[in-house]
């Protein structure tokens, strides 16, 4: 027994004195979820899961927002169309005369009637006879001027836009005629020569399409307007007797829906009238 213990002690002392150092071991990587020191790495798991959940939530949120925006735009468009059709189906007021019939599905006829109504009833052109000149206006813009010059030395008076003392002294038009953009006479005021006793009204502008040609006396219109135009534009050097000079009549009417009379006359037989 003593011999065995002595052998063991000798071997242990020899191992310590030899100074043998053990090689360092490579560290073992710790993976997510791998137990470490008897405990699971739950903190890393929660962090990675949170990033993934946030990404998925962001994608879902963007998708829901896009769908909600699309649905909102569609509802707004449907509401706008519904409101438009509802208003159009009512049509304008009866006295306005802008719509021929109620248009529920389509509005082409109603819109067309409004355009025609505006074209027929709006005063676009004006012929004004002042002193020795006749002017043609489009709205308030002068686009043509005819001067009845005797031997070329008559002064031309141009009215200014701004009101001044000079404007008050300018001669006023002796006669004026108003035309719509399709050439119909829609208004006239002033003194016009009267060569015949036949009373004739120029055709009134109509606010509807179908009844325009039926209600309009075309012959009367041509006879009245051509005479008015010829007398306003062309200055005739006709020697008249005192009795004939008195045959002037003052007329004024408004063509915009009013029914006031406007007396016209036929061109003279000498053929100088403008047709």
Swiss-Prot record:
Localization terms from the record? Spore polar tube
Q: Which InterPro entries match?
A: PTP2 (IPR031507)
Positions of glycan attachment: 132, 248
Q: Spell out the residue ranges making up region: Disordered.
A: 233-275
Which organism does this record belong to? Encephalitozoon intestinalis
Coiled coil location: none
What protein name is recorded for this chain? Polar tube protein 2
**Signal peptide (residue range):** 1-18
Q: Name one GO biological process term.
A: sporulation resulting in formation of a cellular spore
Q: Name one GO cellular component term.
A: polar tube
Predominant localisation class: other
Compositionally biased tracts (Acidic residues)? 253-263
């Amino acid at each position: 027994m003593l011999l065995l213990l002595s052998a063991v002690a000798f071997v242990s002392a020899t191992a310590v004195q030899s100074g043998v150092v053990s090689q360092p071991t490579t560290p073992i990587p710790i993976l997510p979820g791998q137990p470490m020191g008897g405990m699971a790495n739950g903190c890393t798991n929660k962090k990675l899961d949170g990033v993934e959940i946030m990404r998925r939530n962001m994608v879902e949120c963007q998708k829901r927002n896009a769908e909600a925006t699309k649905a909102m735009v569609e509802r707004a468009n449907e509401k706008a169309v519904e409101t438009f059709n509802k208003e159009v189906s009512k049509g304008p007021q009866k006295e306005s005369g802008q719509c021929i019939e109620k248009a529920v599905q389509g509005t082409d006829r109603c819109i067309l009637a409004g355009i025609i109504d505006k074209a027929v009833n709006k005063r676009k052109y004006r012929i004004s006879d002042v002193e020795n000149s006749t002017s043609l206006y489009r709205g308030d813009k002068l686009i043509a001027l005819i001067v009845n010059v005797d031997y070329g030395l008559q002064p031309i008076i141009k009215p200014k836009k701004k009101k001044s003392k000079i404007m008050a002294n300018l001669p006023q038009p002796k006669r004026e005629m108003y035309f719509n953009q399709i050439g119909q006479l829609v208004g006239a005021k002033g003194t016009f020569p009267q060569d015949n006793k036949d009373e004739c009204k120029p055709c009134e502008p109509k606010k509807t399409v179908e009844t325009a040609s039926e209600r309009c006396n075309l012959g009367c219109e041509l006879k009245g307007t051509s005479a008015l135009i010829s007398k306003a534009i062309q200055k005739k050097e006709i020697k008249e007797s005192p009795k004939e000079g008195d045959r002037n009549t003052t007329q004024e009417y408004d063509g915009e829906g009013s029914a006031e009379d406007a007396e016209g006359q036929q061109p003279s037989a000498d053929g100088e009238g403008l047709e």
